[in-house]
Each structure stands twice: as C-alpha cells, then as structure tokens.
Amino acid sequence: MSPDEYCQNKAAASGSSFYYSFLFLPAEQRRAIMALYAFCREVDDVVDECSDRDVARRKLDWWREETAACFAGQPRHPVTSALAPVLDSYNLPVEYFQEIIDGMNMDLEQQRYESFSELALYCHRVAGIVGLLSAEIFGYQHRDTLKYAESLGTAFQLTNIIRDVREDAERGRIYLPLDELLEYRINPHDLLNGEINDALPALLSVQAERANSYYQRALEQLPEQDRYAQRSGLVMTAIYQTLLSEIQADGYRVMRHRIRLTPLRKLWIAWTTARRERRRHRQYLKTPAHA
C-alpha cells in the first residue's frame, strides 16, 4: 500500500464528513488534503484510543519527532511520507503541525475549561490551525481568507463538542465551559456519570448559537474571489450546519444518543453544494471586472 493509499483509507474509514468535502478537488489538492487529514486523525487517535496517559504522551512526542523528520526530508511513517512531497508545493509551516499536537496534548493535560476564552485556545489548536493549513492547500488570493479558515475551523470544533458531549464525558473530558455549566446549574460530575440534566438542552442551545455565529463570521470573512477555491470548506459548512440543525430538531438530546447523517445524505449535500458553488463561480467570472 502506498502512502497516498494509506491516507485515503484512513480518511474513508473514519466516516468523517471531511472525506466527502475532498471528493470534488483536483487530484493534487485531494492528495495533499488527505495527507493533512490523515495526520490529524493519527494524532487524534493517540489521545482517543490510548488509555494510559504516559503512553499517549510518549506517542505524541514520537509524532513531534516524526513531524520534524518529515520537514527534514526523512519521513518514516506512511502519513509523513505522503506529506513530505506536499511540503514543496504548499506553504505549510512546521509550527502549525506542532501546534496541532499541542492541542492534542491539551486533551491529556487539561480536561476542563473554566471559560470560553480557555476553550477558544483549544479550538484554535485542534481546528483553527487545520483550517489555516487547508486554506493554503486550497489556495487563496486575499489574506482575509485566512481569517475565514480559522473561524470556520472553530465553528466545526464547537459543533463537534455539542455532538460529542456524551462520548467526551465517557472519556473524562468536558469541553463545555465550567462557568456556563455553573450558570445553568449543571454539575460536571453529572455529565461524567451520564446523568441527564433538564437544563442541558438550554445550555447546548447557547453553544449552538455560538457555533452558528462562527459560521456566519467565517462566511462574511471569505472574499468572493476566493470562494470557489475554498469550496471544500463550504461543503463542510453545509454538512455541519445540517448536522447542527438535526441536533437542534432532536431537542439537544445528545446524552441519550448521537445524531449522525447517513453517508448518502452527506454525499448529496456535498454534491449539491459543490454544484451550487460552481454555478456561483461562473456567474462571478461574468461580472464586468472579470468578463
């Protein structure tokens, strides 16, 4: 199996919505973003699948070393072997990859967040940075696109936090800000014990409003001239906002079950969004400034 095939299998096997957003990219960009996504999956799996924190720390340290080796032209892992040639084509700073690992390390060292300002740093590291790297791969002309990419990454992460409240609690993690839990009189230990608090839907509604504000901010920050190049992010936005709407329609009962979109529905959303953005781009090219 080639490094590229390894990364593609990693992305497809995860069942992630991101996979569907990559399907409409040119081959070179698709290979690059698959390698980036596979890297994120590998380091995320370290903290999600390793029950011994000391072992997880050592594995993350190994990935730090492997990342440095990749940028030095000496990759050993299939993921970094797929990433290495990508580094010659795109502006992907090594510091960004190290910061992603820093974010994963926060899952080991900090499993509570006193306020949203603390949580925002975590979102920046594990998702905002990924957005910035993705924007470099997709391409852009205006630097405001980087603001869009980081805001969008945070929006995705906030959506994940809402969806995964129960699963995260089962791992001993609470991403809902503690000051907001206190405001709604929700005991963090109740979440950890899987107990259902009647006030949780109201709190999650506030979290959803915050996530939607980041989606809106991101779309407002995206220059029209870069919109088509960044269409994968727009595909993901459509999928994730649909997911968030489904969670809302279900009454935020995330402690009872996990809301999912079927693969067919994700594919349909991805295809229709990509087609809509292609039509919009054609109209943009017909404007007087570009005709």
Report residues per predicted region:
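Catalytic cores of Mg2+-dependent Asp-rich isoprenoid enzymes
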Residues: 1-157, 162, 166-291
